[in-house]
């Protein structure tokens, strides 16, 4: 039990006392202009990377039993060019250096669950990539949740927001 508690304390210490190594400042496509957010990446030593996501303006349905869940992935290219028909296709596919089937891509992350007001916040620990590996890649938010089965990308739907992952000022 002590080890588990100690690791959690270490993660809280990292988030409260360290600066992120990398960041992505997501912006919505022309069809989702209200979506803005910040995804921060903190090295967590031998445990991997802590990913902190804080996103606002997500499109929510307002229904009682809503499913306002949005897939989030690291994509292979850092380009976030958008056109009216296919937003952010320039970002390429999911980061997948080992050529694994979905959902075992390095870039597969848990989804964001939006609140009634369109805001979402999450903290995730992953060992699928290192912070240095994702510099110059992109973060994509999708309109639907990932089903974690459909190949090649989980049937997550339209790409609604994107950002290139950059090294933070502190680490340049």
Give the ranges of each region predicted by the language model:
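N-terminal leader/targeting pre-sequences
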Residues: 1-172
């Amino acid at each position: 039990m002590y080890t588990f508690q100690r690791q959690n304390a270490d993660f809280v210490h990292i988030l409260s006392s360290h600066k992120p190594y990398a960041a992505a400042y997501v912006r919505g496509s022309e069809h989702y202009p209200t979506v803005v957010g910040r995804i921060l990446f903190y090295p967590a030593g031998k445990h991997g990377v802590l990913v902190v996501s804080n996103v606002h303006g997500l499109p929510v349905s307002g229904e009682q039993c809503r499913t306002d869940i949005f897939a989030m992935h690291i994509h292979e290219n850092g380009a976030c060019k958008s056109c009216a028909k296919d937003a952010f296709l320039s970002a390429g596919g999911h980061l997948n250096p080992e050529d694994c089937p979905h959902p075992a891509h390095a870039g597969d992350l848990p989804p964001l669950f939006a609140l009634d007001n369109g805001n979402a916040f999450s903290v995730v620990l992953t060992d699928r990539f290192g912070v240095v590996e994702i510099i110059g890649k992109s973060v994509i938010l999708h309109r639907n949740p990932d089903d974690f089965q459909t190949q090649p990308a989980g049937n997550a739907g339209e790409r609604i927001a994107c950002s290139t992952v950059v090294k933070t000022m502190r680490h340049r």
